[in-house]
Amino acid sequence: MNKVYLVAVLVLFLALTINESNEAVPTGGCPFSDFFCAKRCKDMKFGNTGRCTGPNKTVCKCSI
């Protein structure tokens, strides 16, 4: 029973990891949150502020 439980937990963990990694890929350059997007905009001198937009918040939009 313990082996079955361990295999089930590993499969669930693997499925969640694969699902999460597909959504977390920053396709337009938006890292994790609006704060990091704004920091990236300032560091790269694209603008003063930035926020994540798009259907899954994967695009970082910078503005002056």
Swiss-Prot record:
Kinase listed as a keyword: no
Keywords: Disulfide bond, Ion channel impairing toxin, Neurotoxin, Potassium channel impairing toxin, Secreted, Signal, Toxin, Voltage-gated potassium channel impairing toxin
Entry GO MF terms: potassium channel regulator activity; toxin activity
Signal sequence coordinates: 1-21
Covalent S-S links between cysteines: C30-C52, C37-C60, C41-C62
Expression across tissues: Expressed by the venom gland.
Recorded superkingdom: Eukaryota
Record's keyword annotation contains Secreted: yes
Location(s) in or outside the cell: Secreted
Cellular component, GO annotation: extracellular region
Comment field on protein domains: Has the structural arrangement of an alpha-helix connected to antiparallel beta-sheets by disulfide bonds (CS-alpha/beta).
Function text: This recombinant toxin inhibits mammalian voltage-gated potassium channels Kv1.3/KCNA3 (IC(50)=0.79 nM) and Kv1.2/KCNA2 (IC(50)=26.4 nM).
Family of the protein in this entry: Belongs to the short scorpion toxin superfamily. Potassium channel inhibitor family. Alpha-KTx 11 subfamily.
Designated name of the protein: Potassium channel toxin alpha-KTx J123
Source organism: Olivierus martensii (Manchurian scorpion)
